[in-house]
Amino acid sequence: MSSTSLIDDRDWSSLTLGERIRQIEVEGYLVLPGLLDAQQIADLKTLTATWETQATDYSESQRFRQNIEFDGGLINDLVIANPRTLEFLHALCGRDIILMSAIYARSEPGHPGISLHTDGQPYGSAIFGSAGSAPFMVRVLYYLDDLTPDISPFRVVPRSHLSFHADANPYYRFDSHPEEVMVPAEAGSAVLINHRVFHGNFPNVGSGSREMLALGYRPSW
């Protein structure tokens, strides 16, 4: 982490519904704490331990598995159809929402971090395909481990999805940004983002792995 990085460690549980909606609409990110309890996290970790994963093209220490929605069971009950998450998404987007993607990711010790990027690319891309071209999408990132400063915490550039500047080209990637923010969170929480905001994560310089379930939803309209 850069020594100049800000840390957003506010009490997210104190936000009202209106404040949560404003946070993700204007700032581009939001934390919903305590969506999964300790037993649910343990059950999901037992499941993920059985999955075969692939390494990303930039690091053997970053592993992933796509299309986890087809595993059903716990993934559907605890994650995809999590009632508290859906309640918020319905308030944000309307009653009808569509799941666009569901991915598992594990950042192991030695993971170099992910550069600042967007998941929203209006003409599609080889990485995100047509899903990235949806004009509105919310990414919901469930963390099965604590997001601490040394184990790949989330990073984001607030309000970057609002910029018209050429530097906000959604196909760009950046190593760092002077206004980037580190967002810690406890296991069982989810970070929600506007898919057009620039975000990534910091390196894993700790001794443990960090597991995440990343879902994408868009309003049906």
What is the role of each PLM region?
Residues 111-184:
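Catalytic core of non-heme Fe(II) oxygenases with the double-stranded beta-helix
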Residues 101-104, 140-142, 213-217:
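A structural signal for short, well-ordered beta-strand segments
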Residues 32, 142, 191-193:
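Short hydrophobic-aromatic micro-motifs
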Residues 81, 157, 193:
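A conserved hydrophobic position in a structured secondary element of the catalytic/binding core
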Residues 106, 145-147, 200, 220:
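Short coil/turn motifs at secondary-structure junctions
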Residues 170-221:
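Catalytic core of Fe(II)/2-oxoglutarate
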Residues 107, 157-163, 216-221:
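Short edge-strand/loop segments of extracellular domains
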Residues 1-26, 32-128:
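Non-heme Fe(II)-dependent double-stranded beta-helix
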